[in-house]
């Protein structure tokens, strides 16, 4: 099963529809690039042909393409290694004129530690690269000002309904789909300027029967919901991509959850090649969901839904008969069975983070494994008591960290000693706070207090000695 948006991706800029002005500006930028050597930012809404136009441009010019998008990690090191090296080495290995097109997709989505230093590295790259560079963005002003100022800007606008309909008509002719004009108009209207989504909907509705009427088009608000098991019947147990897409809109589940349900249950009904095709569609859906997580652009949910619903249904070739018992995703069952363990882990990590002033992730991934080794089965009792005192751990959490039995006397005595240490430390702190209120003429009491304080300081020092050895 071939994705029609890929099958009919424009091979030349002349085939790009709905953005003639932007298309011509991109062609002019490429033709004059040796004179100005500027990078260009192509920006606009999702699904209107920005990335396709960049690939079509490279095809026209005979340039190879090196691409980085939001599915890739884009730290400074990665940008330098992949895009930077490609830009510098293109003169030796590239296509026409020895050039490569460096394509940085979703350039407006560089996030925190995930893409650490990526924006600065891209800015340096566009300033110095001896190869043409195209940056693609949905939100132009989400890019850094320094990066915007270093590039030429070309805006792609939403594709109008009258531009979408001829594209759908052309796809129908190539795919031998009999169609009603009103159906194409309805798809174009429904997809509000998103050409890619319009082609996806056309494929979902027309691929099976090769006919398309206005009544077939899913339109308007859906005012009913169905259960997830009904949805699985519509997607897995039938051949109709159209019904599967309708069911996906009717069921009250997110695309992430639908993917989990279908991925776990489709092997119960599909065989051989049809199973392989179904998993290819699920893989495509997962790619789109990854882009949602990377960019927080939930418009991409639509493309994931097309794959996980209509794509999987279209992959079915045979009716295997019988009744299939569907069940919830095994991943969810595993999460349920491990919930108690995860709750204990997070409790300990939270107390470590609050005490040490680090993040939960650092506490969970770096500090906690270290503590487990040092306190394994409570063999180093002093350290285990110090840990329990410092992080205020009770019996179940000491047992979790050390791997010891929760009901053993050893763990109970460690928790009791830790509680005593915390109490002693609190008393010592309170006495220090009121030391100035002791009467000057009560020298005997002062001496006694001094002795007590000295003893408590020794105890306080003991309570910290074990923790010092952790760090």
Swiss-Prot record:
<dbReference type="InterPro" id="IPR047854">
    <property type="entry name" value="RFC_lid"/>
</dbReference>
<feature type="binding site">
    <location>
        <begin position="44"/>
        <end position="51"/>
    </location>
    <ligand>
        <name>ATP</name>
    </ligand>
</feature>
<feature type="compositionally biased region" description="Basic and acidic residues">
    <location>
        <begin position="422"/>
        <end position="431"/>
    </location>
</feature>
<dbReference type="GO" id="GO:0003689">
    <property type="term" value="F:DNA clamp loader activity"/>
</dbReference>
<comment type="similarity">
    <text>Belongs to the activator 1 small subunits family. RfcL subfamily.</text>
</comment>
<dbReference type="Pfam" id="PF00004">
    <property type="entry name" value="AAA"/>
</dbReference>
<dbReference type="Pfam" id="PF21960">
    <property type="entry name" value="RCF1-5-like_lid"/>
</dbReference>
<dbReference type="InterPro" id="IPR003959">
    <property type="entry name" value="ATPase_AAA_core"/>
</dbReference>
<dbReference type="InterPro" id="IPR003593">
    <property type="entry name" value="AAA+_ATPase"/>
</dbReference>
<dbReference type="InterPro" id="IPR023935">
    <property type="entry name" value="Rep_factor-C_lsu"/>
</dbReference>
<keyword id="KW-0067">ATP-binding</keyword>
<feature type="compositionally biased region" description="Acidic residues">
    <location>
        <begin position="442"/>
        <end position="460"/>
    </location>
</feature>
<dbReference type="InterPro" id="IPR027417">
    <property type="entry name" value="P-loop_NTPase"/>
</dbReference>
<comment type="function">
    <text>Part of the RFC clamp loader complex which loads the PCNA sliding clamp onto DNA.</text>
</comment>
<comment type="subunit">
    <text>Heteromultimer composed of small subunits (RfcS) and large subunits (RfcL).</text>
</comment>
<feature type="region of interest" description="Disordered">
    <location>
        <begin position="422"/>
        <end position="471"/>
    </location>
</feature>
<dbReference type="GO" id="GO:0005524">
    <property type="term" value="F:ATP binding"/>
</dbReference>
<protein>
    <recommendedName>
        <fullName>Replication factor C large subunit</fullName>
    </recommendedName>
</protein>
<keyword id="KW-0235">DNA replication</keyword>
<dbReference type="GO" id="GO:0006260">
    <property type="term" value="P:DNA replication"/>
</dbReference>
<dbReference type="GO" id="GO:0016887">
    <property type="term" value="F:ATP hydrolysis activity"/>
</dbReference>
<keyword id="KW-0547">Nucleotide-binding</keyword>
């Amino acid at each position: 099963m071939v994705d029609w948006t890929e099958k009919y991706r424009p091979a030349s800029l002349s085939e790009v529809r709905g953005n003639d002005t932007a298309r011509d500006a991109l062609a002019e930028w490429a033709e004059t690039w040796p004179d100005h050597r500027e990078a260009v930012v192509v920006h606009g809404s999702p699904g209107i042909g920005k990335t396709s136009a960049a690939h079509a441009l490279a095809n026209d010019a005979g340039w190879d393409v090196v691409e980085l998008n939001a599915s890739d990690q884009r730290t400074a090191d990665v940008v330098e290694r992949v895009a930077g090296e490609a830009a510098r080495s293109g003169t030796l290995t590239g296509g026409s004129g020895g050039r490569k097109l460096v394509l940085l997709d979703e350039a407006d989505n560089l996030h925190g530690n995930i893409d650490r230093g990526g924006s600065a590295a891209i800015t340096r790259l566009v300033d110095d690269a001896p190869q043409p560079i195209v940056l693609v963005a949905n939100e132009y002003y989400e890019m850094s000002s320094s990066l915007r100022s270093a590039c030429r800007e070309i805006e792609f606008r939403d594709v109008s309904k009258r531009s979408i309909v001829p594209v759908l008509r052309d796809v129908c002719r190539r795919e031998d789909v009999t169609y009603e004009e009103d159906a194409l108009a309805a798809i174009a209207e429904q997809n509000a300027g998103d050409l890619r989504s319009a082609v996806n909907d056309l494929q979902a509705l027309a691929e099976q029967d090769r006919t398309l009427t206005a009544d077939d088009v899913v339109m308007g608000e859906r005012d009913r919901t169905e259960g997830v098991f009904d949805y699985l019947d519509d997607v897995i147990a039938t051949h109709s991509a159209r019904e599967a897409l309708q069911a996906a809109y009717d069921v009250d589940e997110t695309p992430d959850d639908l993917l989990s349900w279908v991925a776990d249950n489709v092997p119960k009904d599909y065989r051989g090649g049809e199973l392989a095709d179904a998993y290819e569609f699920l893989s495509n859906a997962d790619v789109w969901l990854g882009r949602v997580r990377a960019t927080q652009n939930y418009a991409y949910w639509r493309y994931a839904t097309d794959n996980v619903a209509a794509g999987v249904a279209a992959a079915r070739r045979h009716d295997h008969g019988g009744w299939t018992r569907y069940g919830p995703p095994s991943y969810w069952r595993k999460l349920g069975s491990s919930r108690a363990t995860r709750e204990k882990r997070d409790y300990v990590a939270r107390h470590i983070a609050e005490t040490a002033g680090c993040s939960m992730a650092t506490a969970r991934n770096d500090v906690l494994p270290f503590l487990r080794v040092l306190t394994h089965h409570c063999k180093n009792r002093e350290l285990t008591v110090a840990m329990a005192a410092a992080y205020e751990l009770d019996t179940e959490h000491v047992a979790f960290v050390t791997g010891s039995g929760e009901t053993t006397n050893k763990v109970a005595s460690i928790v009791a000693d830790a509680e005593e240490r915390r109490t002693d430390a609190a008393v010592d702190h309170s006495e220090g706070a009121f030391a100035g209120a002791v009467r000057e003429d009560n020298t005997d009491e002062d001496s006694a207090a001094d002795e007590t304080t000295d003893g408590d300081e020794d105890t306080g020092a003991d309570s910290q000695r074990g923790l010092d050895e952790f760090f």
